[in-house]
Amino acid sequence: MGKSESSVGMMERADNCGRRRLGFVECGLLVLLTLLLMGAIVTLGVFYSIGKQLPLLNSLLHVSRHERTVVKRVLRDSSQKSDICTTPSCVIAAARILQNMDQSKKPCDNFYQYACGGWLRHHVIPETNSRYSVFDILRDELEVILKGVLEDSSVQHRPAVEKAKTLYRSCMNQSVIEKRDSEPLLNVLDMIGGWPVAMDKWNETMGPKWELERQLAVLNSQFNRRVLIDLFIWNDDQNSSRHVIYIDQPTLGMPSREYYFKEDSHRVREAYLQFMTSVATMLRRDLNLPGETDLVQEEMAQVLHLETHLANATVPQEKRHDVTALYHRMGLEELQERFGLKGFNWTLFIQNVLSSVQVELLPNEEVVVYGIPYLENLEEIIDVFPAQTLQNYLVWRLVLDRIGSLSQRFKEARVDYRKALYGTTMEEVRWRECVSYVNSNMESAVGSLYIKRAFSKDSKSIVSELIEKIRSVFVDNLDELNWMDEESKKKAQEKALNIREQIGYPDYILEDNNRHLDEEYSSLTFSEDLYFENGLQNLKNNAQRSLKKLREKVDQNLWIIGAAVVNAFYSPNRNLIVFPAGILQPPFFSKDQPQALNFGGIGMVIGHEITHGFDDNGRNFDKNGNMLDWWSNFSARHFRQQSQCMIYQYSNFSWELADNQNVNGFSTLGENIADNGGVRQAYKAYLQWLAEGGRDQRLPGLNLTYAQLFFINYAQVWCGSYRPEFAIQSIKTDVHSPLNAQVLGSLQNLPGFSEAFHCPRGSPMHPMNRCRIW
């Protein structure tokens, strides 16, 4: 929804101390670097958010005379020995960069292999992972820190933090989880009307009083499962100061709709059906019912048949990019008239959801419908399938979500499905699973522990200064765009200058006298012996905290993500960029490393998020976060034409791991626009910083110019590899291009890159035609 970068000669290489007559200190450092290569900690992060070729618009793709002058100065200054940084931070950074590179590759042929070839050679995907990247490594290291603070019992903390620690201990209490086995799940099944496949005579005992409206409402409000119909509360796209009810098409049991009907996904479907059948059979036996495998298989096949119809009824994500086309506001009467769904009572359904938080529907209540095509198709599906199959499906979606909270035998039932879907053969080690779960559900409490243990508070002000530098470049770059008229440029400038930022963490999580943190989790009462029930509390708390907002004014200062997260975000409804503390660490950012790394790391991230405000989705929202068309017809038309260039460019990248499928340039357009804009803005901001007198430092053992160091650090945050199964899933579902395409596509379009590495026109990294939007 609208809620939610002539080969004049390669660089000089120094293969040994004697060739360049290095000084004693430099030689010593190079020896030290060699020793560090095997042990250097790679701590980077990455954030991961088809058409035919159209004539390209040349949007001032030159490098300005001023930028050329600065680059020449960079090249000149980079040859001086006095600027070599020999601090421990710089030595570690140099070791990391050297280890990740493959200097046998030519940067003008394939810069991704040149920058990341060493990383790809040295890292094997763990059996527990479907993907392994510098982002995953940084997340792993963050989880080690969180494990330490969650297990530390030496200090008594405030109630919110103690609850997080109790939740963690309950997750780690595997002996009790094994002893209780399926008991907690069976108790839940009784609460939600039973699971027909795991009981006898459901049609006679439960069927007569079964109501779809009430079942959907219970799953939504008590278990945070929005099945069949996705009803949720969010900022009104057209009035960002208020909340509104949204109705949309739902998610499915498998990650992508294509898995349900594409021929090449038959193995995944078979494993999914076997997973469903195994779980239902296990529960029947636990209830002392006959296994009746054939009966269970038949009933679950009907569930898969139903879900396949639902998948076909949904609209593919690539056709849902235009939020202005999705948004349809209507009253309850119109909703009922247009989508009767064979007698489905919309007022009853919505009121049952809201009554869980004591909110009453108003006579003139309006809803925003995003999923009109889906709702039009849903009526026939509801008419075809009986109540028993519908109930089997609804309960299955809850069971699927709760499997990870049960004993080991239930996890073993999903092994083949996970192997077919992700390529993984092992479950994640238990403590990591528990750390991730607690951080996801109690992000403010866990974030407070992380900040106290691992975050430098002065990073906030330094990053804020970087944001202003890169925002200024974005505004300056508007003057270079000949596809945009002055009226639209002025509006774009206003929006850019009004982008708000959140950096690191909200202050209240560290303020002992501020009770907001404890109040956030006041309704939760955890027990170390009741992990499954603790999870149900979290589901209910998350659902009801969201539902309560319907009658509340939007809090523009509310943090949309926790502090201990290795990612960054842009919210179009708030015109807000967010940089959690988890990403504000080396090598993305450090006051102790060269500025080339900071601008190529967190600077690129900042530019990426700013540009999201002007991608194919963000551009539909104004400076206040309202969905408003502030574009002239001329500028809007040319934005679409410029976008076609990028769609075509990225659609020509194929992914060998994903059976050589081509990237969907349309689905990935928003992220590609942000990648391109982000690296362009960060590089220009770096050149401006140098032009204004900034003095950078070189890294020992690396004969790289400042500009080359910038681009290598930018590329290396994307180093990573995928299992083939997950690559196939990602190319269907991920809005990001594959990692190598993210690097190659954005740098092919940037003149400053080809100048820094002397790439001749016509070489792979300096194509004859380039795309530019921002």
Curated annotation (Swiss-Prot):
UniProt topology in membrane: Single-pass type II membrane protein
Entry keyword annotation includes Oxidoreductase: no
Bridged cysteine pairs (disulfide): 85-90, 108-759, 116-719, 171-434, 645-771
GO BP annotations listed: protein processing; proteolysis
Tissue specificity remark: Specifically expressed in testis and central nervous system (CNS) (at protein level). Restricted to developing and differentiating fields of the CNS. The soluble form is expressed in round spermatides.
Cellular location(s): Membrane; Secreted
Site residues by UniProt (Cleavage): 72-73
Xref: PROSITE patterns: NEPRILYSIN, ZINC_PROTEASE
InterPro entries associated with the record: MetalloPept_cat_dom_sf, Peptidase_M13, Peptidase_M13_C, Peptidase_M13_dom_2, Peptidase_M13_N
Reactions catalysed: Preferential cleavage of polypeptides between hydrophobic residues, particularly with Phe or Tyr at P1'
Regulation: Inhibited by thiorphan and phosphoramidon.
One Pfam match: Peptidase_M13_N
Sequence positions that bind Zn(2+): 608, 612, 671
UniProt domain Peptidase M13: residue ranges: 84-774
Similarity comment: Belongs to the peptidase M13 family.
Record's protein name: Membrane metallo-endopeptidase-like 1
Source species of the chain: Rattus norvegicus (Rat)
Lineage of the organism: Eukaryota, Metazoa, Chordata, Craniata, Vertebrata
Gene: Mmel1
